[in-house]
Amino acid sequence: DVTTGTVLYENNSHEALAPASVTKVMTMLLIMEAVDSEKIALTDTVTASENAAAKGGSQIYLKAGETMTVSDMLKSIAVSSANDCACAMAEHIAGSESAFVDAMNQRARELGMQDTHFVNCTGLDDDANAREHLTSAYDIALMSRELILHHPDLRRFTTIWMDTIRGGEFG
């Protein structure tokens, strides 16, 4: 139950598995916490790096040097599972994806997520450490609950069924 935190049913809830794009729940949580703490604003402009533009997988095909608002980046992460935007936001907030991943793991510990270890901000499994990128259903519930209870404004992005960015231009 999201309000009380009571588990209503569980089966292998602590089995650590690769979370793939569910990783972006934590990425969005840290972005929303940065917005709420006024470290960044939804209207701030983020510039995509070469690293972000080269992420692959689900993406909106950012070009290196392309700029977009935090709001549009969040929309792209929530709606399109955009790895390029997740990486650009990580770099914008923490200076590097690696530093952002350290913050993700720290936040996971603070939330009591005992079955979780992140190695990137996207969930992509294309690097050497991908086997170490794990979480459990229980831990996903913990971070999702935190996001739902403390960052209800994110719903404006997660409830979109169709929208455009870049004036409807793709890539």
Predicted segments with their positions:
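Penicillin-recognizing serine hydrolase domain
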Residues: 96-171
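Active-site helix/loop module of the DD-peptidase/beta-lactamase fold
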Residues: 47-64, 104-117
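A short, well-structured edge-of-sheet supersecondary motif
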Residues: 1-10
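Active-site SXXK
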Residues: 5, 18-46, 140
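Solvent-exposed, polar/charged alpha-helical surfaces in well-ordered, non-transmembrane soluble domains
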Residues: 6, 29, 33, 71-75, ...
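Conserved catalytic neighborhood of penicillin-recognizing serine enzymes
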Residues: 54-87, 171
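Short, glycine/proline-biased beta-turn/loop segments that scaffold the active-site neighborhood
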Residues: 21, 37-61, 158-169
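Surface-exposed aromatic
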Residues: 15, 54-59, 87-88, 119-128
